[in-house]
Amino acid sequence: MGKRILPQRMGRGTPTFRSPSHRRVGPAKYPPLKLDRTIKGKIIDLLHDPGRWVPLAKIVLEDGTTFLTPAVEGMYVGQIIEIGPDAHISNGNILPIGKIPEGTQIANIEKRPGDGGKFVRSSGTYALIVGRAGTKTQVQLPSGKIIEVPNNARATIGVIAGGGRDEKPLLKAGNAYHKWKVKAKKWPKVRGVAMNAVSHPHGGGSHQHVGKPSTVARETPPGRKVGHIAARRTGRRKG
């Protein structure tokens, strides 16, 4: 009899596969909407969050409200930022996207007003405002896709900090171990064909091969449900 394969163990949710969220600094999102006026805030700290690839800026507002937001390039401790419709077009300021000129680099964009920021939050990324369409603003994401968001959704002026993070080589497996230890990722990821037959349906044999169809049905039982699950097609496209 075989043993429980890796996907079955993952589903049980033991600490090995669970995200260490207790180490996180906190949620990074904008404070509640205050579109009727512009307020100022001060960056009191720049924090490293083990669960992110980007540093966080801790900001305290005039009314004492404190919040975290992904830092943009050029931010520094002690910097005064503005939040609101009349804020200047300056690095780190937060404005409704309808008030930002076309061609401006922006980040941490709200999908809906008040959701705290959903788009362009990864290190080194930015979006561009490319046009207007009534009550919507057209934004080009880092992928090249153009989306429309409401004019009163907020965004930060600038480029998310931490660009070039993945340019430094890991060099050794120990560095990769620590990289993924703080994430909800199991590392290393071993191929099924490299395992023994007892550990995976694709394992075993005198050479590495699947040995059976790699496409399985959606209703396949857990110990066999590996490979191409309910695939419509596999392989290279032809023609």
UniProtKB/Swiss-Prot annotation:
Segments of skewed composition (Basic residues): 225-239
Keyword terms: Ribonucleoprotein, Ribosomal protein, RNA-binding, rRNA-binding
Gene Ontology BP term (one): cytoplasmic translation
Annotated GO CC locations: cytosolic large ribosomal subunit
Superkingdom field: Archaea
One Pfam family it belongs to: Ribosomal_L2
RNA-binding found in the keyword field: yes
Region (Disordered): 1-28, 199-239
Disulfide bonds: none
GO molecular function: rRNA binding; structural constituent of ribosome
The keyword Ribonucleoprotein belongs to this UniProt entry's keyword annotation: yes
Function: One of the primary rRNA binding proteins. Required for association of the 30S and 50S subunits to form the 70S ribosome, for tRNA binding and peptide bond formation. It has been suggested to have peptidyltransferase activity; this is somewhat controversial. Makes several contacts with the 16S rRNA in the 70S ribosome.
Complex and partners: Part of the 50S ribosomal subunit. Forms a bridge to the 30S subunit in the 70S ribosome.
Family affiliation: Belongs to the universal ribosomal protein uL2 family.
Name of this chain's protein: Large ribosomal subunit protein uL2
The organism of origin for this protein: Staphylothermus marinus (strain ATCC 43588 / DSM 3639 / JCM 9404 / F1)
